[in-house]
Structures are given as structure tokens and as C-alpha cells.
A protein has these predicted regions:
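Short beta-strand-loop/turn "lid" adjacent to the catalytic site in phosphate-handling enzymes
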Residues: 52-59, 77-108, 136, 142-145
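Short glycine-rich, Thr/Ser-proximal phosphate-binding strand/loop in the N-terminal lobe
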Residues: 32-68, 72, 151-152
Length: 216
């Protein structure tokens, strides 16, 4: 029997409920649902504090993915989608979140979220999404002042990283840490196209380059 090929690009889906928090006496329960091109995420907030979250791969239906990931985040809490007072949809499929009261671009959400978590000193947010890569500039209140986006090619995007993870047989969650394991400056991959860059990476491996150097 042929051995099943491991999919190194496939990152683990997960969920978590913050211990020690109780929603039953909460005044406001809110949710943010990010339906991306590759992954769908839900974060549940109770009175302005994180209560539960989940992330899973986006399916063929944006609406179905939004409901599935939100129900998974709520699993075991006693909460249902109907108990959430206000929901915002964001990401590639933001307008298809059926239970959301509002849809906001992921660019605005990134800026506000970074400001909420790390405070007013944040000025730049980098987002490597599944189909594009964004550099976002924001002010001390988390308002977007400028942004740049690469949406023309998979090179430099999350999907591009998945391609290299599978090529190098490295689990996707190890790509970042292992790329920092070399002490020398890596040779740049000359191609800006992920297809040609993959071919170039194959050539480097055949030339005897270690996996970590190719990753870097």
C-alpha cells in the first residue's frame, strides 16, 4: 500500500476559550468574523475582553465557513450565535457573513486591532494573507493613514509560503523559525513569480543548499 503523502502546507486548525471568564453576567457580547481566502477566524469578546476564538480553513461557501468557525469558537461555552449582541464581518468574504450587522475591510480591522492589543505606539501592520500581502500605516488611534498591497501574484503571500512548505517538507508553522537558523546572509531568490521561484528553489536544493538556507 502506498504511503499517504503528508501535506506540510496544511496548518493546524484550533480553538480556545480563555479560562476564568464567564459570559453570563456580561453586558455586551460581540464577535468579529474574518472570512479570508484561505482561513476563517472568529473572535468572541465579552465586555471588551477576549473570551474565545477559533481558526479553520475556508470552505467553498463564505457564509457556511463563517457559521462553522463561529459555532466552533462557541462550542462548550453555552453561547449561541443568537446570544451575540453585535457581529462584524471582515476579510475576503465579509459581505457574506449572514449574521453580521456590519462589514468592515480587513485593512481597517488590522489597524484597530493592533492598536487595541499593543497600544498607540503601533504605526505599521504587515498582513501576509492567503492571496495578497498588505503593509498598513496607522495613527495613534488605530486609524489607517495609508496602505500598500500586492495582489498580482502569489509570491510573498501566504499561499506562496504554503507552496514552499510543501516543496521543502517543512510544516508551515516551522517555516518562520527555521528560516532564522542560519547565521549568513541568504542569496535572494531572483524571481518574483511563485512558480519560477519554486523552480529556483528546487535548483538550490539540488545544488546542496540546506533547507533552512532556502527558507531564508
Amino acid at each position: 500500500m502506498a504511503e499517504e503523502k503528508k501535506e506540510f502546507w496544511r496548518w493546524p486548525e484550533y480553538r480556545r476559550t480563555v479560562p476564568g471568564k464567564d459570559w453570563k453576567g456580561a453586558q455586551v457580547i460581540t464577535a468579529g468574523v474574518d472570512v479570508g481566502s484561505v482561513s476563517s477566524k472568529t473572535a468572541i469578546m465579552v465586555d471588551g475582553e477576549l473570551y474565545a476564538y477559533a481558526i479553520m480553513r475556508t470552505g467553498s461557501s463564505s457564509a457556511g465557513s463563517a457559521e462553522k468557525v463561529t459555532n466552533w469558537a462557541l462550542e462548550g461555552t453555552g453561547l449561541t450565535i443568537k446570544d451575540i449582541h453585535y457581529t462584524v464581518g471582515t476579510g475576503y468574504g465579509r459581505v457574506n457573513v449572514p449574521f453580521a450587522q456590519r462589514a468592515i475591510t480587513e485593512i481597517a480591522c488590522h489597524a484597530r486591532g493592533a492598536n487595541f492589543i499593543w497600544g498607540p505606539t503601533v504605526r505599521t501592520v504587515l498582513d501576509m494573507g492567503g492571496q495578497d500581502c498588505k503593509a498598513i500605516q496607522c495613527d495613534s488611534k488605530g486609524k489607517v493613514t495609508n496602505f500598500l498591497m500586492n495582489d498580482k501574484c502569489a509570491a510573498g503571500t501566504g499561499r506562496g509560503m504554503e507552496v514552499f512548505a510543501d516543496l521543502l517538507n517543512v510544516p508551515i508553522e516551522e517555516v518562520g523559525p527555521r528560516s532564522f537558523e542560519i547565521d549568513e546572509e541568504p542569496e535572494p531568490v531572483s524571481s518574483t513569480c511563485v512558480v519560477f521561484a519554486k523552480t529556483e528553489a528546487v535548483g538550490l536544493l539540488r545544488a546542496g543548499w540546506p533547507t533552512e538556507k532556502v527558507l531564508a
